[in-house]
Regions:
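Active-site lid/adjacent beta-loop-alpha segment flanking the redox-cofactor pocket in flavoenzymes
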Residues: 1-79
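Short, glycine-/Ser/Thr-/acidic-enriched flexible segments
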Residues: 8-9, 76, 87-89, 182-183, ...
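Hydrophobic alpha-helical scaffolding
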Residues: 20, 24-31, 87-91, 154-158
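Generic secondary-structure signature for well-ordered alpha-helical cores
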Residues: 43-50, 58, 103-110, 122, ...
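Active-site nucleophile and cofactor-binding loops and adjacent substrate-binding regions
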Residues: 56-57, 84-90
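Ligand-binding pocket scaffold of soluble enzyme catalytic domains
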Residues: 80, 91-93
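Internal hydrophobic alpha-helix adjacent to the cofactor/substrate pocket in enzyme cavities
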Residues: 93-116
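Glycine/proline-enriched, intrinsically flexible loops and inter-domain linkers
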Residues: 112, 116-197
Length: 197
């Protein structure tokens, strides 16, 4: 029997600790991190306690800051195309992603609108190790969550603030983020409780 999971709070990898040639490798077993998930699995399938565990397979996944993969030409390096960050949907989307990426390489543009997965959707401020390390656990936790419209990430915020930010904040602005910019979504001067993001 196989038990798999996406933990509610992921552990970002420390890239400095990985060997340069690390590819398709596994990470050390981390039973302590798995324990809450294992407890839920045992609750759902009590027979697992008698069966026992043979091994814990712990491998890295690639999550982007918004949980959508990256396709397209790198804005930093002309002629360098990316098709990555697919986490667990790579098997399901690989064929179609490969096809449109090949079209893009050959004809200079994709045959359909790919903005939701276009690599250019991120600003440079969103592409720092600190920002990615902060956002990765939240992105993993939301991978199978209900995708409510307008949901805003709580981590890696205040990357880019306009000169008016403090005045807007004083006026009761409730902020959301687009391409790293904090911007008012609505104003709530009395600071009444609002629905969670």
């Amino acid at each position: 029997m196989l038990v798999g999971c996406f933990e509610p709070k992921g552990k970002p990898l420390d890239l400095e600790q990985l060997p340069e040639d690390f590819a398709f490798g596994l990470l050390p077993e981390d039973w302590e991190h798995l324990e809450p998930i294992l407890a839920n699995a045992l609750h759902r399938v009590p027979e697992l306690e008698q069966i026992g565990m043979k091994m814990l397979l712990n491998g890295p996944e690639s999550f982007t800051p918004d949980d959508r993969f990256l396709l397209g030409e790198s804005p930093e390096l002309r002629g360098f195309f990316l098709g990555c960050g697919m986490c667990s949907v790579g098997i399901a989307t690989g064929g179609g992603a490969g096809r449109v990426l090949a079209e893009w390489v050959l004809s200079g543009e994709p045959s359909m609108d790919l903005w939701p997965v276009d690599v250019r959707r991120f600003a440079l401020a969103q592409n720092t190790l600190r920002t990615l390390r902060e956002r990765a656990p939240e992105t993993l936790a939301l991978h199978y969550a209900v995708g409510f419209p307008g949901r805003q990430h709580q981590t890696a915020r205040n990357l880019r603030l306009s000169p008016l930010h403090s005045r807007l904040e004083a006026a009761g602005a409730e902020f959301g983020v687009r391409m790293g910019w904090e911007r008012p979504r609505w104003f709530n001067p009395e600071k009444r409780p609002t629905a969670p993001n």
